[in-house]
């Protein structure tokens, strides 16, 4: 979902890099946060292979990583682009934990 903002550049996700390194604690913020169009900071959380594991856990892991590493300092707003057709409760985590003040539903 960040590819257009990053001028077609592919981005390594938090979970992909954590799997390669062995733990999310072994990642540096600058390795997963890229600056795109109009200086928008972009991060992809990533997730498990389809049918394996819970994609919501990826969102939880990524958001916690971003918070712990100061990604939310000096920003005007944060936008999460998440799937809405999945039964996993992990996708509701930003709402449940008070990380979202407003929610916009976009369908296509």
From Swiss-Prot:
Pfam families recorded: Fer4_NifH
Source organism of this protein record: Desmonostoc muscorum
Binding site for [4Fe-4S] cluster: 54, 88
Cofactor: [4Fe-4S] cluster
Recorded GO MF terms: 4 iron, 4 sulfur cluster binding; ATP binding; metal ion binding; nitrogenase activity
Binding note for cofactor: Binds 1 [4Fe-4S] cluster per dimer.
InterPro entries (UniProt xref): NifH/chlL_CS (IPR030655), NifH/frxC (IPR000392), P-loop_NTPase (IPR027417)
Family of this protein: Belongs to the NifH/BchL/ChlL family.
EC number: 1.18.6.1
Gene Ontology biological process terms in this record: nitrogen fixation
Catalytic reactions of this protein: N2 + 8 reduced [2Fe-2S]-[ferredoxin] + 16 ATP + 16 H2O = H2 + 8 oxidized [2Fe-2S]-[ferredoxin] + 2 NH4(+) + 16 ADP + 16 phosphate + 6 H(+)
Job of this protein: The key enzymatic reactions in nitrogen fixation are catalyzed by the nitrogenase complex, which has 2 components: the iron protein and the molybdenum-iron protein.
Gene giving rise to this polypeptide: nifH
Complex formation: Homodimer.
Gene3D superfamilies: P-loop containing nucleotide triphosphate hydrolases (3.40.50.300)
SUPFAM superfamilies: P-loop containing nucleoside triphosphate hydrolases
Keywords from the UniProt entry: 4Fe-4S, ATP-binding, Iron, Iron-sulfur, Metal-binding, Nitrogen fixation, Nucleotide-binding, Oxidoreductase
Record-given protein name: Nitrogenase iron protein
């Amino acid at each position: 979902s960040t590819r257009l903002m990053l001028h077609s550049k592919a981005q390594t996700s938090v979970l992909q890099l954590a799997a390669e390194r062995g733990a999310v604690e072994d990642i540096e913020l600058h390795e997963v946060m890229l600056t795109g169009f109009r200086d928008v900071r972009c991060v992809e959380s990533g997730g498990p292979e389809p049918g394996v594991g819970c994609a919501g856990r990826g969102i939880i892991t990524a958001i916690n990583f971003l918070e712990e590493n100061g990604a939310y300092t000096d920003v005007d707003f944060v936008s999460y682009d998440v799937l809405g057709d999945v039964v996993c409760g992990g996708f509701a985590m930003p709402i449940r934990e008070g990380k979202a003040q407003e929610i916009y539903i976009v369908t296509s």
